[in-house]
Amino acid sequence: MKSQSHKPWNLVAGIFFPIITFFLSAPLVGHALYLFCMRNDHVYYRDFQSTLPRVQTLVSVSLLALFLLSNIGMFLRPRRLSYFLVIVFFIGFAYSGVYKMESRRFSPTPMCFKGEYNNGQGERKTEQYQVVKIEQSQGRLQRVHLRFVNSYALPPYDRRLLPSVKTGCCNRPGNCKLETVNATLWVTRNREGPPLETAMIYDRYGGNADIKDYYDMWRHELSVLYYDCMTCQVRIIKSPRLRKWWQFGVFLSSLTSLFR
């Protein structure tokens, strides 16, 4: 009698739980495909420019594997997946910033960014600036020079002339309606048109900046890229992109806890 009473419940669990698991885990495929397709998207960041595409590929493959294992796990014994779930659990801790020692080994995590900007004693590293020199001819972009120089090599200038350039991606210009940030660059969508009509944004050897509309400096294009690595440290750590990584870590930890 007891075995017969459990048959309807076993039937419901065997049919509906796999279906529910499939629909709940379906967004993993979408996120994996998005990260895989966007892995070659330019992220202008000095230290992680070469590592972010690899991290995105690794995360997309992991999401696909998690999708398959979560659905296969409905038909297999949980013990067969225990080792994988433990690994995913600690990876989720790393991305959410809870497991601080391991978090520094993952490039996009908040602890990794904090490790880059602090030397362990709470002091800032040597300030470096990325200087973008633009050469234009008849309104068309001809050449872009990107280089890093130490802060002491830059001559002083009037901050009032460029209220939002010195602070780079950290200070948003006043009514620009900026939408997002990709670790170094604020992006606005409501400004369209040709690149800046200026020969040089800032010159290492004392040239005067001539910018007609500094709001245009925040459009997502090479010709208007300029940022200060050091003043952006707080905003980078608290940027929306890192918020997504934190949510991803919480999701992994919660999912593995439910599987357990």
From Swiss-Prot:
Membrane-spanning residues: 11-31, 55-75, 81-101
Annotated Gene Ontology cellular component terms: membrane
Main location: membrane
Extracellular compartment spans: 32-54, 102-260
Membrane topology: Multi-pass membrane protein
Cytoplasmic side: 1-10, 76-80
Gene Ontology biological process terms in this record: auxin-activated signaling pathway
Keywords assigned: Glycoprotein, Membrane, Transmembrane, Transmembrane helix
Sugar-modified residues: N182
Domain of life: Eukaryota
Cellular compartments annotated: Membrane
Protein's job: May be involved in the regulation of cell differentiation.
Family per record: Belongs to the tetraspanin (TM4SF) family.
Record's protein name: Tetraspanin-14
Taxonomic lineage of the native organism: Eukaryota, Viridiplantae, Streptophyta, Embryophyta, Tracheophyta
